[in-house]
Amino acid sequence: WRSIIKNNQDKKKLVITARVKRLIFTISILYLLPVIVIKNTWLFTTIEVVMSYLNPLVVLIAMFINMPVEKLVYLYYKTKAQNKLKSMNKLKIIGITGSYGKTSSKNILADILNIKYNALPTPRNLNTYNGLIMTVNNHMDKFTDIFIAEMGAYVKGEIKRLCKLVKPKYGILTRIGTAHLETFGSQENIQKGKFELIES
């Protein structure tokens, strides 16, 4: 019973992000439109019934409507992160990638560096493009001396894209294995993809 209670306590609370809130708002508007526009009761009821059966389609339409807004929001946060990195001239950036051992290597390195410096590792497994943007915007401040960026990839070119964003001066390559072989296509592609950090 103790383990069950502990597991329940460890469960994360549901977090509704700003993007989800915008999507819910657009979906609500789509469902309210018939109420505002259509005066015929029979036609209104018919449309509402049809829409209730086509919920997934309504969500897809809402997502399509929100696409321009989401692109602007994404561009805003990306530019904000890039400007912050450019403004921190003394910041040293270390990139870490590999098939296995990225997170543990990152955490060990952060513990060592934090003895003398103020090192910021990417939290948890935020090793994607959006994860790095989020880390820079939400966790980095003027007191950060070293940024340790964990970099994950599923296809060739992804590590190169991450390097263009944060521009690491140093790189650490951990073990390369067969993780994500189905998306990379071959062992050779995995090696090439991971070595993009060293080449950058």
Short names for language-model regions:
Residues 1-26, 30-200:
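Phosphate-binding loop of NTP-binding sites
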